[in-house]
Amino acid sequence: MVEAAKEKIKSGDVFQVVLGEILEVGTNLGSLEFYERLKKNNPSPYMFHFPTPYGCVAGSSPELIMEIKKDEIFVAPIAGTRSRGANAEADAALERELLSDEKELAEHRMLIDLARNDIGKFAAPASVRVQNAMRVVRYESVMHIVSEVYGSKPRGVSAVEGLGTIFPAGTLSGSPKIRAMQIINELERYERGIYGGGIGFWRFNGDVMQAILIRSAIFVNRGGQNFCSDENSKRNSNLNLNSACGEEKSEA
């Protein structure tokens, strides 16, 4: 699957394709207990636990699809990952390595451009701007390169229209987005289902927050399927989540 995607990139068919995978594991934990331990050992800004017709979903997402607050649009693309170091010195060395990795930086710049383009399709003219570009944000198990992209939502454009323009997130699809999604549909062995969807809230005043449904597990008959992130990175942050989830199971 990965090699086929690389050939698509080499041929110029697409610049980037973000492939996904499903890891099926057995566990004695219930979904709520899993969520509680995940929150303790691998906290993220957007954590969730909720029932669906397919099973209970629990997860720890670091990333937004989109937030609109008082008509300000906000997207924070994440691309570029390293594991956390054993101490502050190791963390600093890994951060320097991450910020000097041309592959990671090129991927991140591409996603900034994609976010600017997506927001620009429905934002007020000349309102799209990038702030705090290429900063490293540290989480419990990993560190990521993160940038912030803003725009102003004009009157007459609803949050639903805005989300429809941005969805799915570029970090879960690729660039150009439509062609990347076609390739994903061709190459991935399973339909994504809820993976890569949105989880969040809508307010009556028009504010909205939708996080990306990644780094999550769906519990079916008390078992778990781990919906992981991009397969193209050698230092895949999924492995860090899988490791964190393994720590949950070892405590059971």
Where are these regions (language model features)?
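Extended alpha-helical targeting/anchoring segments
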Residues: M1-A252
